[in-house]
Amino acid sequence: MAVVGPTAGGKSDLGIEIALALGGEVVNADSMQLYRGMDIGTAKVPEAERRGVPHHLLDVWDVTHPADVASFQADARRIIDGLLAAGRIPVLVGGSGLYVRAVLDNLAFPGTDPGVRARWEEELARVGAPALHDRLAARAPQAAAAILPSNGRRIVRALEVVELTGTFTATLPEHRSVYEVVQIGVDRPDLDQRIADRVEKMWGAGFPDEVRRLVECGLREGRTASRALGYAQVLAWFDGAMDSAEQAKLATITATRRFARRQRSWFRRDNRIAWLDQPDVTQVRRLVGSL
């Protein structure tokens, strides 16, 4: 089983319900919940609220670790294969579209070279994303055409891959499943309000203090973790780029809503996903029974 969809839709709770109903275990596919200590800002389900359901691939990386979908893919498939061999149902839960596809579909990822990546990261900081995009366009026009000039992270990755392999494909191949899987999509008409409520709850739970603690663990040096929703906005406030905690909070709400729209667009393109408008395990039971 896989439970996917935009943030704040109720995927985590539904994943636990499904695991309890089917005798399963949760496998995380939220790229930011892989980071240790990033708990409040990623809405990681506290252990006391997991209702005895084992959760895998939470708290795997330090905040200084760069995103690595290839290693995540290997780890997730190893865990899923082990659960299947033991007669347990893996329940993959997350809204990180590439990470979900990396596990479920026949995707291969080019290798990485930290030295090459660091050199292009430095160049990004020096000249900016649009100028670096021009360089990508000169070396790999088709790749550049598929990447926004403002998306520095993807531009750097594309340049790294071009340097290492001589080519880069910016689009993913067609869906080709590795597993027999039922994918449940959770979306809600009140998502904007739920996002605002979640961010308010984050601040009430001491989210800025969590960010302060993670700064001491190297959050600023983490190329991926420091850009996470909420964390980037609080760091900007700490650095004086925002005037107040309230401004950082409102910026987090806006950025999260924008991200949720992108998530929705990503997952809606996959016609293998059966969509629910509420995270209801009864609907899931009926759906599974009809397949």
UniProtKB/Swiss-Prot annotation:
Query: What GO biological process term is on the record, naming one?
Result: tRNA modification
- UniProt cross-references to InterPro entries, sorted A to Z: Dimethylallyltransferase, IPT, P-loop_NTPase
- The protein in question is named tRNA dimethylallyltransferase
Q: What is its EC number?
A: 2.5.1.75
Q: Name one GO molecular function term.
A: ATP binding
Could you tell me the keywords of this UniProt record? ATP-binding, Magnesium, Nucleotide-binding, Transferase, tRNA processing
Q: What function does the entry list?
A: Catalyzes the transfer of a dimethylallyl group onto the adenine at position 37 in tRNAs that read codons beginning with uridine, leading to the formation of N6-(dimethylallyl)adenosine (i(6)A).
- Please list the reactions this protein catalyses: adenosine(37) in tRNA + dimethylallyl diphosphate = N(6)-dimethylallyladenosine(37) in tRNA + diphosphate
Q: List the source organism.
A: Frankia casuarinae (strain DSM 45818 / CECT 9043 / HFP020203 / CcI3)
Has the keyword Phosphoprotein been applied to this entry? no
- What gene makes this protein? miaA
| Binding of ATP, residues | G5, P6, T7, A8, G9, G10, K11, S12
Q: Which family does it belong to?
A: Belongs to the IPP transferase family.
Protein's UniProt keywords contain Transferase: yes
Q: Where is this region: Interaction with substrate tRNA?
A: 30-33
Site positions per UniProt: Interaction with substrate tRNA: S96, R117
**Which proteins does it associate with, and in what oligomeric form?**
Monomer.
Entry cofactors: Mg(2+)
